[in-house]
């Protein structure tokens, strides 16, 4: 739900559709102009293609650019610039959903009976680094979902999550406030999120529960640094990627490496950074 809410917020600001067709995301890729059966969910980096034929075992997804796409549920990697890849799509399983390299997707994963009951639930950040730079970016917008306080009192959270290189063998994952420049509504670098606003205070206990990063080389050490400069060494699990044999219903030749950080001890609405020491 946070991905949808953020997509609708972006749409309210720039007028672009929540479900973006291939031609809108890649306007210079003429080969993708007639692809009308798959879509990107806002600016999240999630590419979705539901099966629409009886008895389908897979779908063929068109990939426009030279980038890795990670299956959200399996971690399989797909790459075929200007080509199509077969992705499993049994009707009894998940809808095919690929996360484009270069994106960060914040999700709430606890199943509730209503959105209101999720209000203070923790988040998981899914990070798919870009193929060349190991960089990524994603946005999150939240308000109370009930009133006009977001408009009248600037009571909302507007966060930007970025993964960048921080010198040889080091990466930095950071949380900062979004600016008008970030969402292309102005040239201003002033933070959109007003510090200490009512919604920020109401959700001040909402934490990041897990961070999952695909496609990294081996990770040696991770340190979290909060807004006050306090540092904490974090435990994590790292699983190396492996090769696999493509099939007629699954074109992936690789299972991505997976880094999982449980309880990184950071809050969703505050500034913080996490430093990762990786193999060169």
Enumerate the language-model features and the residues they cover.
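Long, continuous compositionally biased terminal/linker segments
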Residues: 250-252
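Catalytic core of carbohydrate-active enzymes
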Residues: 1-229, 240-244, 255-256, 261-275
